[in-house]
């Protein structure tokens, strides 16, 4: 069932009928006749419909000879002892293929966008898969150009890498995500898959509508869309929230392995993936480990994260929103994620209050790719000089606030002027925000980004006014804007 072996749901033949003997919230015990006990991770489907849909269970444990304990993917409120469940003979399956583009799915791959069933050319694959073997993985470190200056210069993303996206509400996280989706489609002809794990229904709805408005998703012609959305919403049982990321990842793997795409895979929020696993673990009766988390935390996180990688055919680059409980970075849940990250993109409220978007903090954001071996010596040196200038400006701000600019040396005054220009030049008009800002969007190539900032730090543009650097693409746009300001 792995790789290019696709299966239709209809092909799954029942291999046994079991009877419900115990119902708990989100967990169900089912008894099967001898010889008909399904495997662990096998999917069971109810004979009856509950609230208009069949209930799906996933086998989590074998209890004795004939009994299995299962995790429910839907509400168990209407379930009764004696209800029948059929073993499908398969794991839970996810729809894959171009027919999924522009659609919104739940954890079971059922469309929830009101646009009817998916096209008949969609295949179904099991959501549990092994990570690519060492021989299948591409080891060459290659930068994924996003077209966003601040990211490409100071915290570049690796193809097949994992990026942690840190940011509170209202600092532009959604717009940044949509621009990344749009730019990857534009520059790499790649698709994006978004997994809403424990997502608020309102936020998920807002994201979908904004994607439709910006053209990332086309409701009239879904095949022209650039993204797939998969939601396991906050009101759903922990089983659905725990598995929705794997459903979305299976869709992303298809685009990588079968179509050779460079895929962007978004997870919002990784903490909720861990949290739902903790809930399920407690319901299954496992003894918790530190701080109440499941004893299998590291294994569950690793099983998902190791599937996100570059192969010889394509890549999956993951951008993962991470909530840090009580700002405690030593908490086991975020700590388990940090071990897998290659880059961090930190969105700052202080920068957004200055009106600089994207509000990426250039000093807090980091990347393993920012080394001479990966990006080249010129890019590395320019990035380090930009950071040095911004850091010095930050340290001088208290002096400026108390004593004023006049008390600075000529050298410091020049450095502050360059820092303010760099700060504004890190802003950029986005394609997906054209409707709101009135500025045409700009995709800046990596070569143009490095050339532009190199000229800035070397003082080639000291004569241009600060305003010329705000909300432009490359340095040529800044020069044109400066001419228009005169």
From Swiss-Prot:
<keyword id="KW-0139">CF(1)</keyword>
<dbReference type="InterPro" id="IPR036121">
    <property type="entry name" value="ATPase_F1/V1/A1_a/bsu_N_sf"/>
</dbReference>
<dbReference type="InterPro" id="IPR024034">
    <property type="entry name" value="ATPase_F1/V1_b/a_C"/>
</dbReference>
<keyword id="KW-0813">Transport</keyword>
<dbReference type="GO" id="GO:0005524">
    <property type="term" value="F:ATP binding"/>
</dbReference>
<dbReference type="GO" id="GO:0016887">
    <property type="term" value="F:ATP hydrolysis activity"/>
</dbReference>
<keyword id="KW-0472">Membrane</keyword>
<dbReference type="GO" id="GO:0005886">
    <property type="term" value="C:plasma membrane"/>
</dbReference>
<keyword id="KW-0067">ATP-binding</keyword>
<dbReference type="InterPro" id="IPR005722">
    <property type="entry name" value="ATP_synth_F1_bsu"/>
</dbReference>
<dbReference type="Pfam" id="PF02874">
    <property type="entry name" value="ATP-synt_ab_N"/>
</dbReference>
<dbReference type="InterPro" id="IPR055190">
    <property type="entry name" value="ATP-synt_VA_C"/>
</dbReference>
<dbReference type="InterPro" id="IPR003593">
    <property type="entry name" value="AAA+_ATPase"/>
</dbReference>
<keyword id="KW-1003">Cell membrane</keyword>
<dbReference type="InterPro" id="IPR050053">
    <property type="entry name" value="ATPase_alpha/beta_chains"/>
</dbReference>
<dbReference type="InterPro" id="IPR027417">
    <property type="entry name" value="P-loop_NTPase"/>
</dbReference>
<dbReference type="GO" id="GO:0046933">
    <property type="term" value="F:proton-transporting ATP synthase activity, rotational mechanism"/>
</dbReference>
<feature type="binding site">
    <location>
        <begin position="167"/>
        <end position="174"/>
    </location>
    <ligand>
        <name>ATP</name>
    </ligand>
</feature>
<comment type="function">
    <text>Produces ATP from ADP in the presence of a proton gradient across the membrane. The catalytic sites are hosted primarily by the beta subunits.</text>
</comment>
<dbReference type="Pfam" id="PF00006">
    <property type="entry name" value="ATP-synt_ab"/>
</dbReference>
<comment type="subunit">
    <text>F-type ATPases have 2 components, CF(1) - the catalytic core - and CF(0) - the membrane proton channel. CF(1) has five subunits: alpha(3), beta(3), gamma(1), delta(1), epsilon(1). CF(0) has three main subunits: a(1), b(2) and c(9-12). The alpha and beta chains form an alternating ring which encloses part of the gamma chain. CF(1) is attached to CF(0) by a central stalk formed by the gamma and epsilon chains, while a peripheral stalk is formed by the delta and b chains.</text>
</comment>
<keyword id="KW-1278">Translocase</keyword>
<protein>
    <recommendedName>
        <fullName>ATP synthase subunit beta</fullName>
        <ecNumber>7.1.2.2</ecNumber>
    </recommendedName>
</protein>
<keyword id="KW-0066">ATP synthesis</keyword>
<dbReference type="InterPro" id="IPR000194">
    <property type="entry name" value="ATPase_F1/V1/A1_a/bsu_nucl-bd"/>
</dbReference>
<dbReference type="Pfam" id="PF22919">
    <property type="entry name" value="ATP-synt_VA_C"/>
</dbReference>
<keyword id="KW-0406">Ion transport</keyword>
<keyword id="KW-0375">Hydrogen ion transport</keyword>
<keyword id="KW-0547">Nucleotide-binding</keyword>
<dbReference type="GO" id="GO:0045259">
    <property type="term" value="C:proton-transporting ATP synthase complex"/>
</dbReference>
<keyword id="KW-0997">Cell inner membrane</keyword>
<dbReference type="InterPro" id="IPR004100">
    <property type="entry name" value="ATPase_F1/V1/A1_a/bsu_N"/>
</dbReference>
<comment type="similarity">
    <text>Belongs to the ATPase alpha/beta chains family.</text>
</comment>
<dbReference type="InterPro" id="IPR020003">
    <property type="entry name" value="ATPase_a/bsu_AS"/>
</dbReference>
């Amino acid at each position: 069932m792995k790789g290019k072996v696709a299966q239709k749901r209809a092909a799954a033949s029942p291999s046994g009928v079991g009877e419900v003997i115990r119902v708990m919230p989100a967990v169900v015990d089912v008894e099967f006749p001898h010889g008909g006990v399904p495997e662990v991770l096998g999917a069971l489907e109810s004979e009856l419909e509950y609230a208009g849909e069949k209930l799906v269970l996933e086998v989590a444990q074998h209890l004795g000879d004939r009994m299995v304990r299962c995790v429910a993917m839907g509400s168990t409120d209407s379930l009764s002892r004696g209800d029948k469940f059929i073993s499908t003979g398969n794991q839970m399956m996810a729809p894959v293929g171009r027919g999924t583009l522009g659609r919104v799915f739940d954890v079971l791959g059922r469309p929830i966008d009101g646009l009817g069933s998916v096209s008949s050319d969609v295949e179904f694959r099991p959501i549990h898969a092994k990570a690519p073997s060492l021989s299948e993985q591409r080891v060459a470190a290659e930068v994924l150009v996003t077209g966003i200056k601040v990211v490409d210069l100071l915290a570049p993303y690796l193809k097949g890498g994992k990026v942690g996206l840190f940011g509170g509400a209202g600092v532009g996280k959604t717009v940044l995500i949509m621009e990344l989706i749009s730019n990857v489609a534009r520059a790499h002809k790649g698709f994006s898959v978004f997994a809403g794990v424990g997502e608020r229904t309102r936020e998920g709805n807002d994201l979908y509508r904004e994607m439709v408005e910006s053209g990332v998703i086309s409701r009239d012609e879904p095949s022209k869309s650039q993204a797939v959305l998969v939601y396991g919403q906050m009101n759903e049982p922990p089983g659905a929230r725990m598995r929705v990321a794997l459903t979305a990842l299976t869709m992303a793997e298809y685009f990588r392995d079968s179509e050779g795409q460079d895929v962007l895979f978004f997870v919002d929020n990784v903490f909720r993936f861990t949290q739902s696993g903790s809930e399920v673990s407690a319901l299954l009766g496992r003894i918790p480990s530190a701080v109440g988390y499941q004893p299998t935390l590291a294994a569950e996180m690793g099983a998902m994260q190791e599937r996100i990688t570059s192969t010889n055919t394509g890549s999956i680059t993951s951008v993962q929103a991470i909530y840090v409980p009580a700002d405690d970075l030593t908490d086991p849940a975020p700590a388990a994620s940090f071990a897998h990250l290659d880059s961090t993109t930190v969105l700052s409220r202080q920068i957004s209050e200055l009106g600089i978007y994207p509000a990426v903090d250039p000093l807090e954001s980091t990347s393993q790719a920012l080394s001479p071996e990966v990006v080249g010596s010129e890019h590395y040196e320019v990035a380090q000089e930009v950071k040095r200038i911004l850091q010095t400006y930050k340290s001088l701000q208290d002096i400026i606030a108390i004593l004023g600019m006049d008390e600075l040396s000529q050298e410091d005054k020049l450095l502050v002027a360059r820092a303010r220009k760099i700060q504004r030049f890190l802003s950029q008009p986005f394609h997906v925000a054209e409707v709101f800002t009135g500025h045409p969007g700009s995709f800046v190539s990596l070569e143009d980004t490095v050339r532009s900032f190199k000229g800035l730090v070397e003082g080639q543009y000291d004569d241009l006014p600060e305003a010329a650097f705000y909300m432009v693409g490359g340095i040529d746009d800044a020069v044109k804007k400066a001419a228009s300001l005169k």
